[in-house]
């Protein structure tokens, strides 16, 4: 089956899994692939796919010998490109950043290079062919391991290049990328091997743990539906070792094992090895399941002779025994000794070992430990320490307790000192140890036993010395210097890696880390002293840190002879952990200007002394630790030294190691960065001599001393410390602001100040960095955390100010006080203006400088006079277009803004002006009205508001009752144009929340909130039956329209500027859909009682016009009463006609009484003018044919007052008009329609005028409207003609064209009239 499954199918799964975010989706894709590609007949081929999914667990193939660096060079040869070509350099320097993408990810970098040389079509390579090619690639490495000639290495590299070249020809770039990741055994799929095993079969992980054989797992568990009986371990098959859990201190470890029998063992610093003995066949399996056959020459004979059973499995540690010092050697020499036993002393590394051995031999001769003949033959050898047994004879013992396994171990293994040892509390190493050394393993009965054993193991295991040890050490070191081997010195201390605590009743579990074994290491307890070292180089990271420096090469200073600043630095170690991402980014940003690329084999900077070892060689150097600059100032010359590098404080394991990689005599194990020392200059870093003194002081002979009674006590200032937040805790010092949820947070400076003052200080605001809501302490503290009865200083005041919530402060209040206490009004007339400056783009880029200067100047003008500049459009009150060289209109602005910001332009509060407004205001030292300079069209706001505002339900109880009476009309009323006609469409979406419109509060009256009725109640588009109106009802509704809430479509609120002591006027415009000429018959036949009730409540409610009323000006109840009273006085009782007698007498009397109580004169400065008769745009007036009735005259008089109130706004207010989008579109398409005046249109107008109220489409010679005195100049300046005598005004307040000006260029007509005119011949 694998012969037919394409590799591209597996690659597609890899790509999908790398994009998925959840592990469940990844597992599902793996399951789908296994079910799809491997059906019931192909289950035996699961191994061919899983070995590619889990390349790290495939032990049959072995090692490829190709990591990133070697793979890059082989790939360059396979592609046949020059080594100095850009692509070859890109592959070689895959970690480096710069302008490259995917830096730090070798597979992605290689895919970029391959993409330019490979096609996108797959070559149809199968999974079997891929496995065969990878087997050949691994076979070349395994065959070359038998030889060490350079020629064979070159041949091996060429053979690998040919294999990769053949794969490149049969794959595309995507498939080759995943092949390289399989070779590197790092797929980065984001799914664990445990998840893969569980998706393959529920018992797969358990079987792999005891066999470590992926093929066996795939063959035995090919049917997912059948469970497998748990298999035991077998000799010859590697077993996953049992692991230990890390603990930070002895007390926590003892709590986990409390109540159990515990054994404490020394944790050796060697290689974890399982020894499998099957007769004379010996295997040495590491924890990675690899068989280390190099240990066989030195250990096989010892194991065969001293293990008393034919078949067994031992678990232990492979170490090196130093026969000269009679101790275990330091970590790192295992492999060297194994190779020395196998190949002889031929390499340079073994030559270095010889020099070490010579120095040790001289020391041994002086202390008479060893004869000269024995030195070269028995100085160091391999030694195995077994601490557990898993198999003995023909039986697995992993299910027995640790106590029983220790007993079996003592029976099976015969210890041989320096070769084979066992680690048990009652024998083995404990018997062979010198009398003055601590035990290697003990039974712990209490926490004190554990702590004592840990201290003895880590701090007090030394080589026994004689009185002349110091002299011998000097002799040894001088001898090493004579051999030019000064990078090494002799370490007489044996510091073990830590201790292991084990439960004696526990069973041996493969791969388990559940807490039955606990490890305690010295670097978990207390690290070595912090070392202040200097950064001299950097290494690029991989993965998410790819392309950026992620690790640093640090150095030690070499002391100068003349006591001046150091001039040379030795490479010391490589460190990269310990910093957060933010700290690391800040450090790299600071050092990046001083990085210099390391172009090996060029020499490093002259300040640094390095070994040029491949593991030491950094990617970048710091040019120099210091930077001197000579400056001249008049007759004075002075030199300034600046620090280019940074000092960092590092810590590590307390054990130091000899190093061949770095130039310093010692290096550190597991170094990590503690903190950044920006406060230290470069010349104060640690020098070599001081570091050597630290090492020697820790390596000298120590004696167990009595406990120091001079340590600081916890009761120095009377307080106590608690690890847990219990009831006894009175104060808590937190590290994060999240602790504010638990209570008040106190700054640590409070403790320091209390200690300094020798008394308990009061908690002042400066000690509370996270001020809590003060409702908890209202009797002591105010809303800003200021105590009523405690004095505060400047620091307290600053803390209070810094914690104030600026959002709770009313901006209007701030502006009020700024304006009130401003010294000069000339510098605050822009107060309250938040301006967004739109920089118009320039066609010619050469004028950018001029434009930038202009923008900078207008911003300064704004801020100097109290305004604010905002960077986003949302909070802006003004949008100023800054255009220097070309005119920029609103259409250009609207098109250039993104859709998300265009909606802000429809806000009536946003003023869109040119920069001329700001310049003129600054020149006149006052804020000029924006209307003259406005660029926003008149109709933009109205149309968009009508489309975007939400509908609301009326909040008045009486109106709700009236709506119930008018339900039939609402049901049969047609919907607006463009809305779906089905009832389901209306109910599919829930009704939006009502839009509450709040008016300003006047005096002691409450602010008015009017709710607009939803669009379903719109009566402006009723059917054909509504053409027969009830004149009496209409007349009553006309009179009451100023006292009733409007129940039509949403009105558009227009707020005019406040004049003097009068309140700002708000006028509500009616949309075109509420044309009274289209109201239905049912809408006109209203009950007389209903009208009377509306009239009675006119003085108690603030309501809008009836749906059939035009757009009118909304005013307060007091103003309406005075205006109505004035109307009655002007018309008089003699002017009323017969039609007026049809009104309800009670209703009229109540209205007159209400009107006489609230009298109000017209606003000052308004003059009454008479408008000539003119038909409003294609609609013939009916007033010339039918005598106007008194009730019509009354309504016209009301409209005169409304018009006067509308037109008497601020001097520069622009007149607004409603423009229907369809109407405008038709006029643009057929301009001649604006000039047409057909009989059909007149007939339609006449027919509509018969049913319309008097204010719609009609005007008489007595139509009067007040006009502001100063409106002419302002209107002319804004581009809008001012109304004058003899002009006609529509009911919406839009000025009609002047009759003396001739025919208009574009005459506005109703789109229904246009449709009727277009369809008249049809």
From Swiss-Prot:
Record key words, sorted: ATP-binding, DNA damage, DNA recombination, DNA repair, Ligase, Magnesium, Metal-binding, Nucleotide-binding, Nucleus, Repeat
Annotated Pfam families: DNA_ligase_A_C (PF04679), DNA_ligase_A_M (PF01068), DNA_ligase_A_N (PF04675), DNA_ligase_IV (PF11411)
Record-listed Mg(2+) 2 binding positions: 497
Binding site for Mg(2+) 1: 317
Gene3D superfamilies linked to this entry: BRCT domain, DNA ligase, ATP-dependent, N-terminal domain, DNA ligase/mRNA capping enzyme, Nucleic acid-binding proteins
Keyword Transmembrane helix set for record: no
A GO molecular-function annotation: metal ion binding
TM annotation in the entry: none
Region described as Disordered: 945-1212, 1245-1310
PROSITE patterns, per the entry: BRCT, DNA_LIGASE_A1, DNA_LIGASE_A2, DNA_LIGASE_A3
GO BP: DNA recombination; double-strand break repair via classical nonhomologous end joining; double-strand break repair via nonhomologous end joining; nucleotide-excision repair, DNA gap filling
Source superkingdom: Eukaryota
BRCT domain segment(s): 686-768, 825-935
Compositional bias annotation for Basic and acidic residues: 957-969, 1007-1022, 1033-1047, 1082-1104, 1125-1161, 1190-1204
Active site: 267 (n6-amp-lysine intermediate)
InterPro entries linked: Adenylation_DNA_ligase_IV, BRCT_dom, BRCT_dom_sf, DNA_ligase_ATP-dep_C, DNA_ligase_ATP-dep_cent, DNA_ligase_ATP-dep_CS, DNA_ligase_ATP-dep_N, DNA_ligase_IV_dom
Cofactor: Mg(2+)
Keyword Nucleotide-binding: yes
PANTHER family per UniProt: DNA LIGASE 4
Function: DNA ligase involved in DNA non-homologous end joining (NHEJ); required for double-strand break (DSB) repair.
Family classification: Belongs to the ATP-dependent DNA ligase family.
Protein name: Putative DNA ligase 4
Record gene name: LIG4
């Amino acid at each position: 089956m694998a012969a037919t499954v394409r590799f591209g199918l597996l690659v597609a799964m890899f790509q999908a899994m790398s994009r998925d975010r959840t592990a469940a989706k990844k597992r599902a894709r793996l399951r789908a692939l296994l079910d799809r590609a491997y059906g019931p007949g192909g289950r035996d081929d699961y191994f061919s796919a899983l070995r590619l999914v889990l390349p790290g667990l495939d032990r049959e193939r072995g090692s490829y010998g190709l990591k990133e660096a070697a793979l890059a060079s082989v790939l360059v040869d396979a592609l046949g490109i020059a080594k100095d070509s850009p692509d070859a350099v890109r592959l070689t320097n895959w970690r480096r950043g710069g302008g490259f993408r995917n830096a730090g990810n070798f597979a992605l970098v290689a895919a970029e290079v391959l993409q330019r040389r490979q096609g996108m079509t797959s070559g149809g390579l199968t999974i079997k062919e891929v496995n065969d090619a990878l087997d050949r690639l691994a076979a070349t490495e395994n065959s070359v391991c038998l030889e060490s000639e350079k020629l064979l290495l070159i041949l091996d590299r060429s053979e690998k290049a040919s294999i990769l070249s053949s794969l490149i020809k049969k794959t595309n770039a995507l498939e080759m990328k995943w092949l390289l990741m399989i070779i590197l055994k790092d797929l980065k799929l984001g799914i664990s091997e445990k998840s893969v095993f569980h998706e393959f079969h529920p018992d797969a992980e358990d079987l792999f743990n005891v066999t470590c054989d992926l093929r066996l797992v795939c063959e035995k568990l090919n049917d997912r539906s059948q469970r497998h009986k748990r298999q035991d371990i077998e000799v010859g098959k590697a077993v996953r070792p049992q692991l230990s859990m890390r603990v930070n201190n002895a007390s926590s470890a003892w709590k986990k094992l409390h109540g159990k029998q515990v054994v404490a063992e020394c944790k050796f610093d060697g290689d974890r090895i399982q020894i499998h003995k099957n007769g004379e066949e010996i295997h040495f399996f590491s924890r990675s399941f690899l068989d280390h056959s190099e240990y066989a020459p030195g250990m096989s004979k010892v194991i065969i002779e001293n293990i008393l059973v034919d078949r067994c499995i031992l678990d232990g540690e492979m170490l090196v025994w130093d026969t000269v010092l009679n101790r275990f050697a330091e970590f790192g020499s295992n492999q060297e000794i194994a190779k020395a036993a196998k190949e002889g002393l031929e390499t340079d590394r073994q030559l270095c070992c010889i020099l070490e051995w010579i120095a040790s031999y001289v020391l041994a001769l002086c202390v008479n430990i060893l004869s000269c003949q024995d030195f070269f033959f028995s100085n160091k050898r391999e030694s195995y320490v077994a601490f557990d047994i898993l198999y003995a004879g023909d039986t697995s013992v992993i299910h027995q307790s640790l106590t029983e396994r220790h007993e079996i171990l003592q029976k099976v293994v015969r210890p041989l000192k320096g070769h084979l040892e066992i680690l048990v509390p009652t024998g083995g190493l404990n018997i062979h140890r010198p009398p003055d050394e601590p035990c290697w393993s003990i039974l712990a009965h209490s926490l004190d036993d554990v702590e004592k054993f840990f201290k003895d193991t880590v701090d007090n295991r030394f080589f026994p010395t004689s009185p002349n040890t110091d002299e011998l050490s000097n002799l040894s070191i001088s001898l090493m210097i004579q051999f030019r081997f000064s990078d090494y010195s002799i370490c007489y201390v044996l510091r073990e890696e830590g201790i292991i605590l084990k439960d004696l009743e526990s069973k041996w579990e493969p791969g388990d880390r559940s807490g039955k074994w606990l490890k305690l290491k010295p670097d978990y307890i207390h690290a070595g002293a912090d070392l202040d070292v200097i950064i001299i180089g950097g290494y690029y990271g991989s993965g998410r840190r790819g392309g950026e420096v992620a690790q640093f090469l640090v150095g030690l200073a070499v002391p100068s002879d003349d006591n001046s600043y150091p001039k040379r630095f030795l490479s010391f170690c490589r460190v990269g952990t310990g910093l957060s991402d933010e700290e690391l980014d800040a450090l790299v940003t600071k050092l990046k200007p001083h990085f210099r690329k390391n172009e090996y084999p060029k020499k490093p900077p002259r300040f640094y002394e390095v070994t040029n070892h491949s593991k030491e060689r950094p990617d970048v150097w710091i040019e120099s630790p210091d930077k001197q600059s000579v400056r001249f100032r008049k007759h004075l010359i002075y030199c300034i030294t600046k620090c280019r590098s940074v000092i960092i404080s590092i810590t590590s394991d307390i054990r130091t190691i000899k190093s061949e990689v770095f130039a310093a005599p010692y290096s550190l194990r597991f170094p990590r960065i503690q903190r950044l020392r920006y406060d230290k200059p470069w010349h104060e870093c640690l020098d070599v001599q001081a570091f050597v003194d630290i090492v020697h002081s820790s390596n000298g002979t120590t004696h167990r001393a009595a406990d120091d009674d001079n340590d600081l006590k916890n009761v120095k200032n009377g307080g106590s410390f608690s690890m847990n937040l219990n009831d006894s805790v009175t104060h808590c010092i937190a590290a994060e602001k999240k602790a504010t949820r638990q209570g008040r947070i106190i700054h640590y400076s409070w403790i320091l100040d209390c200690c300094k003052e020798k008394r308990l200080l009061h908690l002042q605001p400066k000690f509370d960095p996270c001020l809590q809501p003060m409702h908890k302490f209202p009797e002591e503290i105010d809303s800003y955390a200021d105590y009523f009865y405690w004095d505060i200083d400047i620091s307290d005041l600053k803390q209070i100010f810094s914690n104030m919530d600026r959002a709770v402060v009313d901006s209007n209040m701030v502006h009020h006080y700024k304006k009130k206490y401003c010294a000069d009004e000339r510098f605050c007339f822009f107060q309250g203006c938040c301006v967004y400056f739109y920089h118009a783009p320039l066609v010619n880029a050469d004028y950018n400088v001029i434009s930038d200067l202009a923008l900078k100047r207008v911003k300064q003008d704004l801020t100097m006079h109290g305004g604010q500049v905002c960077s986003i459009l949302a909070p802006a009150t003004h949008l100023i277009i800054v255009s220097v060289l070309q005119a920029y209109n609103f259409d250009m602005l609207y098109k250039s803004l993104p859709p998300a910001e265009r909606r802000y332009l429809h806000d009536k509060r946003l003023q869109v002006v040119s920069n001329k407004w700001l310049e003129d205001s600054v020149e006149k030292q006052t804020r000029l009205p924006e209307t003259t300079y406005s660029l926003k069209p008149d109709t933009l706001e109205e149309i968009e508001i009508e489309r975007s505002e939400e509908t609301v339900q009326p909040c008045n109880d009486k109106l709700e009752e009236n709506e119930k009476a008018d339900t039939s009309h609402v049901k049969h009323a047609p919907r607006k144009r463009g809305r779906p006609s089905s009832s389901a469409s209306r109910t599919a979406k829930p009704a939006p929340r009502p839009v509450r419109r709040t008016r300003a509060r006047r005096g002691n009256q409450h602010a008015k909130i009017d709710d607009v009725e939803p669009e379903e109640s719109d009566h402006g588009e009723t059917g054909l039956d509504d053409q027969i109106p009830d004149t009496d009802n209409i007349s009553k509704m006309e009179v009451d329209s100023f006292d009733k809430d409007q129940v039509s479509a949403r009105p558009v609120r227009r707020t005019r500027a406040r004049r003097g002591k009068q309140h700002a006027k708000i006028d509500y415009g009616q949309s075109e859909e509420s044309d009274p000429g289209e109201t239905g018959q049912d809408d006109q036949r209203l009950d007389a009682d209903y009208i009377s009730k509306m009239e009675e409540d006119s003085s108690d409610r603030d309501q809008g016009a009836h749906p059939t009323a035009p757009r009118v000006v909304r005013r307060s109840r007091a103003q309406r009463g005075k205006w109505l009273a004035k109307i009655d006085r002007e018309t008089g009782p003699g002017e009323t006609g017969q039609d007026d007698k049809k009104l309800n007498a009670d209703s009229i009397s109540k209205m007159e009484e209400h009107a006489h109580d609230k009298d109000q004169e017209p606003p000052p400065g308004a003059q009454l003018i008479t408008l000539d008769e003119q038909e409003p745009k294609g609609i013939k007036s009916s007033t010339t044919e039918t005598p106007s009735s008194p009730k019509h005259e009354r309504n016209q008089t009301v409209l005169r007052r409304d018009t006067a109130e509308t037109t008497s706004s601020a001097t520069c207010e622009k007149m607004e008009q409603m423009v229907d989008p369809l109407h405008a579109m038709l006029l643009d398409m057929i301009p001649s329609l604006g000039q047409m005046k057909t009989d059909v249109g007149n007939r339609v107008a006449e027919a509509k005028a018969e049913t319309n109220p008097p204010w719609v489409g009609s005007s008489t010679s007595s139509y009067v409207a007040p006009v502001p005195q100063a409106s002419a100049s302002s209107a002319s300046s804004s581009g809008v003609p001012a109304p004058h005598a003899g002009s006609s005004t529509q009911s919406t307040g839009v000025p009609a064209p002047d009759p003396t000006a001739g025919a208009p260029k574009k005459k506005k007509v109703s789109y229904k009239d246009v449709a009727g005119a277009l369809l008249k011949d049809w």
